Amino acid sequence: MQSLKKYRRITVKIGSALLVDRASGLKRDWLDSLADDIAVLAQGGAEILVVSSGAIALGRTILGLGKRALKLEESQAAAAVGQIALAGAWSDALGRGALKSGQILLTLGDTEERRRYLNARATISTLLKMKAVPVINENDTVATSEIRYGDNDRLAARVATMMGADLLVLLSDIDGLYTAPPARDPKAKFIPVVDRITPDIEAMAGAAASELSRGGMRTKLDAGKIATAAGTAMIITSGTRLSPLMAIERGERATFFRPSANPVKGYKTWIAGQLEPAGRLTVDAGAVGALASGKSLLPAGVKLVSGNFSRGDTVAILSPDGREIARGLVAYDAADAVRIAGLKTAEIETVLGYEARSAMIHRDDLVVSHAGGDISGG
């Protein structure tokens, strides 16, 4: 396993079940041990960002809401109570190692809308320059099912790539990736290293999540695809033991995901990491080949348009068999895209009634994903 001390900027994600016990509340001893690990890495020159789940779980414990399913407004109220307690706990724990901390609450638009993405990145960068540890969570007090990340694994990957982290560590209640969910298959084999997240690797993930958290192995692999495509390595390991980061240093079990050899950079990192494409364009075999060779997507190659998107939105591009092969910023809104799908460039102006762009998605706004999980700028 790779030593954490070789990395200069590390994003660490903590699952709810690690931080919160339903009976006793916050696991302070565990949190203190993790904060001590962070202090060791910081003293070695690393910059650490924390993505911390647990606000709703902690809030429902404080409020005595029990195990029943919560209504949306109850979850948001629990998050409000839990978040203030969680922020204080992080401040106290990190302060033991003379580390300052700052709370960042994000909603989906803060990473998916370009201007807000740049603003969030600037704020977090300033915290790091000031030697403060950013403690980041989704703003569950205002997020709804339609406008939320849904899990902090993908949020952590989005933060890691936004901030140019060279390592993402997902601490969970499972110690890595297996050939099948170990709870279902006692013969499942542990996988120490993943070179690329292929469809075969994705098939190994079960959909089940912990009782207190929303994520499962599938969301962790989704996070891995986002992170590794941008050149960020990833580790999945158990956080149930004390001092979980130093446990990695000691060689405890963990799965290491290698970063892409051809990572997406800069502007295209934002496009590639979009979590919720506004629509989908299904293309023909000829367009698949053109995209793979670095060309723009022309209307002639588009066979099906789905979704209600506007010009400039991110859309997913699907192959004839339904696999996602690229993402890009579309040059037309959905209504016009439907009208010109399948048309040659010379026919577009006649149909739309105005001089329009020749490409549905220009190559400069396009990120092509290749088999095996690598992504290139096209």
Swiss-Prot record:
> Which superkingdom heads the taxonomic lineage of this protein's source?
Bacteria
Q: Which CDD domains match?
A: AAK_G5K_ProB, PUA_G5K
**Where's the PUA domain?**
278-355
Q: Name one GO molecular function term.
A: RNA binding
* Binding, ATP: K13, S172, D173
Q: Where in the cell is it found?
A: Cytoplasm
Query: Mind naming one GO cellular-component term on file for this protein?
Result: cytosol
Q: What pathway does the annotation place this protein in?
A: Amino-acid biosynthesis; L-proline biosynthesis; L-glutamate 5-semialdehyde from L-glutamate: step 1/2
What protein does this entry describe?
A: Glutamate 5-kinase 1
Q: Which UniProt keywords apply?
A: Amino-acid biosynthesis, ATP-binding, Cytoplasm, Kinase, Nucleotide-binding, Proline biosynthesis, Transferase
EC number(s) for this protein? 2.7.2.11
The cross-references to Gene3D superfamilies, in alphabetical order and at most eight, read: Acetylglutamate kinase-like, PUA domain
A Pfam short name: PUA
What family does the entry list?
Belongs to the glutamate 5-kinase family.
Residues annotated as binding substrate: S53, D140, N152
SMART domains linked to this entry: PUA (SM00359)
A GO BP term here is: L-proline biosynthetic process
General function of this protein: Catalyzes the transfer of a phosphate group to glutamate to form L-glutamate 5-phosphate.
Catalytic reaction list: L-glutamate + ATP = L-glutamyl 5-phosphate + ADP
